[in-house]
């Protein structure tokens, strides 16, 4: 009998963790997780203890022999791990709220993974994940790193280009959400639907859609023009598309494309929300407070349905399916973030792309799509340039590189506004950006 798997989740005190635990419980027969180590930082210790105790109740109720370990010692947890998943947030939700509110002051989209907010989440996150990568290299060099931390594309880009790890996969729930949305719009079972995904994280397109192997792209594009088929996420306003624009685009956009193709409407929605219910981070803080109160209930031993309000639908499906496919060498097709290696012709070979891959025990094998359609190619290339420059800024702490990244992002209207936002956000996040400030003060 083979020994069970050791999985380490960094950011284990996350409100999403019960969904991950549920995923491992459901798949125990094909994915024998023996140890699940939930790791967090001292500021997250209370949440870690609450969610970890719930996780223990869940595995006990399910009758599966998964040992749950809770720790603040990352290195202790990582020793001899088989898989490491990352789902942490540097600066917690308070930092996200600043990422959302500060750009709005300048009339710019304030969002977790797009525009200035996405840049600053990357600047805070990348140095931390590169330190984690060094620990993995030393303590569990054969482990797969499965990154869920946003901005997942930029973070995967940095891991591929600035760490020595080769076993790296970036993961997102957006493609699964699109697939579910397509099935709902067509009123069919999701297992009958396949989508040809290609692009970048939160910048992924469905180049074609198949129902029972037959293309139904035109039918899906027609359905997306109907407001009842918004196909968006909890965290993104479902502003209505112009049906003629979708037909001209001739691919399936994801919810995040509204920030680029409907910037005016999305900005208006954000400004209004910031004056009423609050920014998305502020809404999530309230949702999380409610969730952790539920998690404390000693009689709760399942994932509560209220977790779906948090916006991470299908998170565990994406993560557990990926880990199971690598472990079992399934050779099934999943959309993940991985090194391009020519899969998308107009993106550098050494960059991270989000594309359908055949999942094997040696990792994802991207399915080449050639060039992206001219209708979306330029935007994808522009965002990839932004991600590459942003990753460089995160690693070097160079002010001018950060200003370049901010300015070339298509959601930022001028170099002057870029500098104003950059300066204010650098100061606001100073505690989490030592690479910029230690240099200045040295």
Swiss-Prot record:
Site feature: Increases basicity of active site Tyr: 112
Induction (record text): Induced by lichenan, lichenan hydrolysate and cellobiose. Subject to carbon catabolite repression.
Pfam families associated with the record: Glyco_hydro_4, Glyco_hydro_4C
Positions bound to NAD(+): 5-73
Domain of life: Bacteria
UniProt-recorded Gene Ontology molecular function terms: 6-phospho-beta-glucosidase activity; hydrolase activity, hydrolyzing O-glycosyl compounds; metal ion binding; oxidoreductase activity, acting on the CH-OH group of donors, NAD or NADP as acceptor
Swiss-Prot/TrEMBL cofactor(s): NAD(+); a divalent metal cation
Enzyme class: hydrolase
Catalytic activity: 6-phospho-beta-D-glucosyl-(1->4)-D-glucose + H2O = D-glucose 6-phosphate + D-glucose
Family the entry assigns: Belongs to the glycosyl hydrolase 4 family.
Its job: Hydrolyzes phospho-beta-glucosides.
Protein name (record): Probable 6-phospho-beta-glucosidase
Organism: Bacillus subtilis (strain 168)
